[in-house]
C-alpha cells in the first residue's frame, strides 16, 4: 500500500507513522522479536519529499544531475539515457560550476560525514539489539513492547539513510536529521535497558 497522499507525506516519520498505525511489519527480528520495516531505496522521497532537497526546490530533476546533455546526428539536443555520476561527466559538471566551486569535494565531505555516522550508529544499534535479545525474557510486557518499538524505529531511520544510495549527497541535511532521529531512539532505548550510551 502506498502511504503517500502528496510530497509532504514522503518523509521517514510519515512513512513510519503510517505503517505503525496499520500494525504492518516486513518481518520479525529473529533475536529481539521486534516487528521490523525495510526502507525501500527512498531516493525520490529523499529528494522530493517533505521539505525537499535544495536542488528540488530550485526545480532540478534527477536527469539534470545524472543524465548528460547529448546531441543526435540531426543536431537535436536531448538528455542522455545513460545514468552517470555527475562528478565524472564534464558536461554535467560545467552546469554545476556556476553555483558549486568544488562540487566533487563537497560531495566527498557530505558522504564521509554520513557514512561515518552510519557506522557509528550501526555499532550502537548492534549493541542495543544484543542487549535487548539478552534481556527480553526478563522484561515485563510493556517494557518489552517499548524496547521493540525503539528497535523498529531506530533501525528504520538508520536504514532510510543507509539504503538511499547517495550516502547523504542527495539531501545532506535530511540524512543527518534522520540519523539524529535514530540516535534519539537509541538513547531512549539505552536508558530503558540500563545501558551506557
Role assignments for model-derived ranges:
Residues 1-64, 68-196:
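Primarily the internal scaffold of c-type cytochrome electron-transfer domains
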